[in-house]
Amino acid sequence: MNTLGRFLRLTTFGESHGDVIGGVLDGMPSGIKIDYALLENEMKRRQGGRNVFTTPRKEDDKVEITSGVFEDFSTGTPIGFLIHNQRARSKDYDNIKNLFRPSHADFTYFHKYGIRDFRGGGRSSARESAIRVAAGAFAKMLLKEIGIVCESGIIKIGGIEAKNYDFNHALKSEIFALDEEQEEAQKTAIQNAIKNHDSIGGVALIRARSIKTNQKLPIGLGQGLYAKLDAKIAEAMMGLNGVKAVEIGKGVESSLLKGSEYNDLMNQKGFLSNHSGGVLGGMSNGEEIIVKAHFKPTPSIFQPQQTIDINNNECECLLKGRHDPCIAIRGSVVCESLLSLVLADMVLLNLTSKIEYLKTIYNEN
């Protein structure tokens, strides 16, 4: 499937080296002021070619809105948008057109469909994630109207982990590092991987919070069984290229703790800790929503690797092209967009949870 969401639905299309990639965002309420500066800034954050720590492929990533916006406001109809591919170099992939690149989707796409677009991975390329960032910008505009903001940064590159989380610093950092003190060591780890024609994995931290410091997030976003907020977050992020694990709150560490250590105690002012990551019973509890997305090392490395071709013959694969040495860096921005899309979808879903909400809408007329 190529669609994410239920009430706010994003459908994407296009391939890495096709003429365009694009999306249709259906379910966006009317009357939302389109923040073009926000849209442009989000695309630039994800953009490659800005420094040595990301892919040299630098696309313009100008978002062409084709429908759903009139006089700078959303109309309530589907928002269609296109992003042109202008910097593709398909010749870089001629030598692997009949080979399966190790740990890429080539093998599975070929066996599932019997045909594959070998140019940059086609539909399986992370180039598609630019669409999710554009759609996430629209979702952010919706969330801003009700006082919710999402932000992200890098907490780990290889084994080098942040000890302090500063989201303001992440916005200024070349690698979106959350910890200024650990940033140089993390950069060195990436540079060493590049020097050795290798790549490295990383972990992104994404959070949602109230825009106002003295307010909480809405309680009750998500549903208790088949639309759990944490499940939908994990589903969205696991659908992103290279993500191999997603944690909410304490995540994996929870399995090492006792109940007396893990439980979030409460008083009249609220929760005394946030080990649950802002989600209880599949619904938001008002605290910050805390998510970690674990990215594998970029599978495109410039070392000879053993593989097979489409005829099952063993051979050697030596890649060319332009690739991210650490996909977690730009991936953190995409995860932030995905969290925004999921929360916007859940906000719209929540309108159906109480008859009072519907009465408020329809009794106004």
Swiss-Prot record:
UniProt catalytic activity: 5-O-(1-carboxyvinyl)-3-phosphoshikimate = chorismate + phosphate
Cofactor: FMNH2
InterPro entries: Chorismate_synth (IPR000453), Chorismate_synth_AroC_sf (IPR035904), Chorismate_synthase_CS (IPR020541)
Name of the protein this chain belongs to: Chorismate synthase
A biological process term (GO) from this entry: chorismate biosynthetic process
Pathway(s) this gene product operates in, as recorded in its UniProt entry: Metabolic intermediate biosynthesis; chorismate biosynthesis; chorismate from D-erythrose 4-phosphate and phosphoenolpyruvate: step 7/7
Broad class of enzyme this protein falls into: lyase
GO cellular component, one term: cytosol
Cofactor note as given: Reduced FMN (FMNH(2)).
Family: Belongs to the chorismate synthase family.
EC number(s) on file: 4.2.3.5
Binding site for FMN: 123-125, 241-242, 281, 296-300, 322
Gene name as annotated: aroC
UniProt-listed PANTHER family: CHORISMATE SYNTHASE
Originating organism: Helicobacter pylori (strain G27)
Known partners and oligomeric status: Homotetramer.
Amino acids binding NADP(+): 46
Keyword field: Amino-acid biosynthesis, Aromatic amino acid biosynthesis, FAD, Flavoprotein, FMN, Lyase, NADP
GO terms for MF: chorismate synthase activity; FMN binding
Lineage, highest ranks first: Bacteria, Pseudomonadati, Campylobacterota, Epsilonproteobacteria, Campylobacterales
Function: This reaction introduces a second double bond into the aromatic ring system.
